[in-house]
Every structure is written in C-alpha cells, then in structure tokens.
Amino acid sequence: MRALVQRVTSASVRVDGDEVGRITPPAGGHGLLVLVGVTHTDDEAKAALLAKKVWTMRILENEQSASDLDAPVLVASQFTLMADTRRGRRPSWSAAAPRPVAEPLVDEFTGALRELGATVETGVFGEHMEISLVNDGPVTLLIDV
C-alpha cells in the first residue's frame, strides 16, 4: 500500500458538486490529507501498518504526530499512486489493485485510523473527486508499506 500524506491547514473533497468530506483543524493547527493507493499484494495487515505509520508520523508542529495532537485526517482513494512511469510517455496502471481488492483495503485503512483514535473524513471510492487543500510547508511524504 502507498499513501501520499500532506500536512494541511484545511482540506475538503467534493463529488458531483456536493461536499462529502472536510477537515478544518483548530486555528494555527494542522491536519493530514492522505491519498491511498492499493496494489495486488496488499492485505489487511498492510492497511493496519500504514494507518499506524500515518497516524504516528512526526510531521506536525514541534515534531509531533497527528496522534499527539488529535489532528483530523481526510482520506481519499487514488489508484494513480500505483502508476508505473518508468517507460514511455503513458503510465501503466497494472500495479493498481482492482476495485474488489482495493475498496475493502481502503476501508480497512480508514477503520484502522479510527480505531487508533483519529477523526477521519473520507472521499467516495471510485468516484471522480475534486479535492481542495491548503498544504502547509509544504510537507508531502510518500509512504510505502
């Protein structure tokens, strides 16, 4: 599994013009926008490990984690994170898991974050989403497990 994690001062996601998720940390605070990609060999253990890593990664103020600050998290699935761009000019999507594999694992990741104590908002799996964010820093990390 792969997560693109961004430290944000706000983030929201819209589907068909309707807002389906939003995080607004307290004034001066941060939250995390997490885009999640799943490959064929991923499983529930990897989803739980990725959730723990994201929740405890020390990328917020004063080298603290989202866990330390109860920072909100917005999660959206993004199969394009699994693109292979090493050859030619057209990305290959063959490493991205199909929906029957990926959707339950994104749900497992989100559930694991909630079990760890996170306040989590989500996008809608498989839908075209418009994501708005204010990336602070910028701080953007790619995490693979």
UniProtKB/Swiss-Prot annotation:
Gene Ontology terms, MF aspect: D-tyrosyl-tRNA(Tyr) deacylase activity; Gly-tRNA(Ala) deacylase activity; Ser(Gly)-tRNA(Ala) hydrolase activity; tRNA binding
Task: Give the subcellular location.
Answer: Cytoplasm
InterPro entries given for it? Answer: Daa-tRNA_deacyls_DTD (IPR003732), DTD-like_sf (IPR023509)
EC number(s) from the headed UniProt entry = 3.1.1.96
Q: Catalysed reaction per UniProt?
A: glycyl-tRNA(Ala) + H2O = tRNA(Ala) + glycine + H(+); a D-aminoacyl-tRNA + H2O = a tRNA + a D-alpha-amino acid + H(+)
Keywords, A to Z, come to: Cytoplasm, Hydrolase, RNA-binding, tRNA-binding
- Which GO terms are recorded in the biological process aspect for this UniProt protein? D-amino acid catabolic process
Q: Name one GO cellular component term.
A: cytoplasm
Motif Gly-cisPro motif, important for rejection of L-amino acids — list its residue ranges.
137-138
Keyword RNA-binding (UniProt): yes
* Domain notes from UniProt: A Gly-cisPro motif from one monomer fits into the active site of the other monomer to allow specific chiral rejection of L-amino acids.
Give the protein's function: An aminoacyl-tRNA editing enzyme that deacylates mischarged D-aminoacyl-tRNAs. Also deacylates mischarged glycyl-tRNA(Ala), protecting cells against glycine mischarging by AlaRS. Acts via tRNA-based rather than protein-based catalysis; rejects L-amino acids rather than detecting D-amino acids in the active site. By recycling D-aminoacyl-tRNA to D-amino acids and free tRNA molecules, this enzyme counteracts the toxicity associated with the formation of D-aminoacyl-tRNA entities in vivo and helps enforce protein L-homochirality.
Q: Return the protein name.
A: D-aminoacyl-tRNA deacylase
Species of provenance: Rhodococcus jostii (strain RHA1)
Q: Which gene encodes it?
A: dtd
